[in-house]
């Protein structure tokens, strides 16, 4: 059975009414994520974290049009080949976010998928959350959320975590997850890429 990406009740409340298109690695990238997250959780056991490593391609606020949005994502995914993910570094988003991340390389297939989704959504009126232009987007898997840490605690965590990963693990992902949060719970559908 597929594990939920988010299980923390506070996070679930904050995501209510939102939808996301994410990639969920299951091979070497996922193994790297799990091992790194375990180390970080030992250092700050009270900090919230995603239960499953995932790469967000887009977020939405379309609680009343989930079915219509899902159909749009299915149509987009049908024309997208599998996507290569490669770990580039353990990095961090600074305050006010204070999130330690697994940063990914900008592989051609990952950049193309993000760009084509942007182009497709440009012809719609779906309300998007946190969207940035391709050149500003950092492809990543959030490892641990440190926004509640003091500045000193955060700096200690960040300094101990951040590092380059030369020739980092890689894998090819053949599906996307369409995830929506409704009624205090996470729901998802796996959509195969390329048809």
Q: What do the PLM-derived regions correspond to, one by one?
A:
Residues 20, 99, 140, 173-175:
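Short hydrophobic/aromatic beta-strand or adjacent loop that forms the aromatic wall/cage
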Residues 1-86, 104-167, 185-195:
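Basic, often amphipathic N-terminal segments
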Residues 98-104:
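Surface-exposed, active-site-proximal loop segments in enzymatic domains
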Residues 90-96, 171-187:
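Glycine-rich beta-strand-turn "strand-cap" elements at beta-sheet edges
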Residues 54, 96-98:
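A short small-residue
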């Amino acid at each position: 059975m597929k594990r939920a990406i988010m299980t923390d009740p506070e996070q679930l409340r904050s995501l209510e009414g939102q939808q996301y298109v994410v990639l969920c690695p299951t091979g070497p990238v996922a193994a790297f994520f799990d091992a790194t997250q375990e180390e970080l959780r030992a250092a700050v056991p009270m900090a919230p974290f995603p239960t499953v490593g995932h790469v967000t391609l887009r977020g939405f606020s379309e609680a009343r049009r989930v079915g219509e949005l899902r159909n749009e994502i299915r149509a987009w995914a049908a024309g997208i080949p599998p996507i290569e993910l490669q770990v580039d570094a353990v990095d961090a988003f600074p305050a006010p976010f204070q999130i330690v991340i697994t940063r990914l390389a900008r592989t051609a297939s990952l950049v193309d998928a993000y760009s084509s989704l942007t182009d497709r959504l440009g012809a719609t009126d779906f309300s998007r959350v946190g969207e940035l232009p391709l050149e500003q987007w950092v492809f990543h898997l959030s490892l641990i959320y440190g926004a509640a840490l003091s500045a000193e605690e955060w700096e200690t965590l960040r300094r101990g975590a951040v590092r380059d990963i030369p020739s980092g693990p890689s894998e090819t992902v053949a599906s996307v997850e369409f995830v929506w949060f409704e009624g205090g719970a996470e729901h998802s559908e796996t959509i195969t890429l390329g048809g």
